[in-house]
A protein has these predicted regions:
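Residue-level recognition of single "structural anchor" positions
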Residues: 1-261
């Protein structure tokens, strides 16, 4: 606690962070952040509850809050620079029905990848007006942007990027100049394996925090930064409205044994 002699009021450095109003000790929170940063996969709620000695409800909410913190840290990441190659692609997370086009189902995720990290963003559709603002947000102007030949990317050069595309339908995965999207496609495989290995099937409404957690740790490894140090280096304001009503209902329905949060 901090005491101000001028206004004679007490304050806490935890105000505005995920630790505010929590009955769980700060040491327990930091230990869980260390566990998450050192794990290559998403931690299951049951493991956290057993390991920390808290209820499943508390474990669920702690994990959710830390993921929102990671999402806030990773939200403004800008990749690339003038002359550097950025790879952009989309993928589907979840079930995919047989066939193509309208027969598909699943969550659409846009990825922006470079040698310094990756950003993965859940998007509602693959329209140009959805894709371009995110690419502009996370790719530095003047970068080379490598994509497949999806028609929405055809006018990327008008945004100040130097665009190169590959025709995957004709099995063109690397251009004569050496440009490719192999990096982002490899990242998709890594992400999907991570979600499957822990039997994690987040609903589409709450998918983004899981994507941000995985992308944050992947980017830290790419840049040679300790994930835990990056996680506690800053505590931006959290918009808890992003934690949807669906998540709150999940807690009430599945973890009705009381909470320590």
């Amino acid at each position: 606690m901090i005491y101000c002699l001028k206004c004679q009021k007490r304050g806490s450095v935890l105000v505005g962070t995920i630790f505010e109003h929590s009955k769980i000790s700060l040491g327990t929170w930091l230990y869980l952040m260390l566990l998450m940063s050192n794990s290559s996969h998403t931690l299951p709620v049951s493991f956290v509850a057993r390991h920390l000695g808290v209820t499943a409800s508390s474990a669920f909410r702690m994990l959710a809050c830390i993921r929102l913190h990671i999402e806030a840290l990773h939200r403004g990441l800008v990749l690339g620079c003038s002359g550097e190659v950025i790879q952009v692609d989309e993928t589907l997370i979840g079930s995919v029905k047989a066939g193509k086009g309208g027969g598909r189902s699943g969550a659409i995720v846009l990825g922006v990848y470079s040698s310094k990290g990756v950003v993965a963003q859940h998007i509602p559709n693959r329209r140009r007006e959805t894709l371009f603002p995110l690419i502009q947000l996370h790719a530095a102007p003047g970068s080379w942007v490598a994509t497949d030949q999806f028609r929405a990317y055809s006018s990327l050069s008008k945004l100040g990027f130097r665009h190169v595309s590959m025709n995957h339908g004709r099995r063109e995965f690397v251009t004569a100049e050496g440009y490719s999207t192999v990096g982002i496609e490899g990242y998709w495989a890594n992400l999907k394996f991570s979600l499957r290995s822990c039997n994690i099937t987040p609903n589409f409404e709450n998918l983004q925090p899981y994507l941000s957690e995985h992308a944050f740790k992947f980017s830290c490894r790419k840049r040679g930064i300790a994930p835990f140090e990056a996680m506690i280096a800053d505590f931006p304001a959290i918009d808890f409205g992003k934690w949807s009503k669906r998540a709150a209902r999940d807690i009430e329905n599945h973890f009705s044994d009381g909470t320590e949060f």
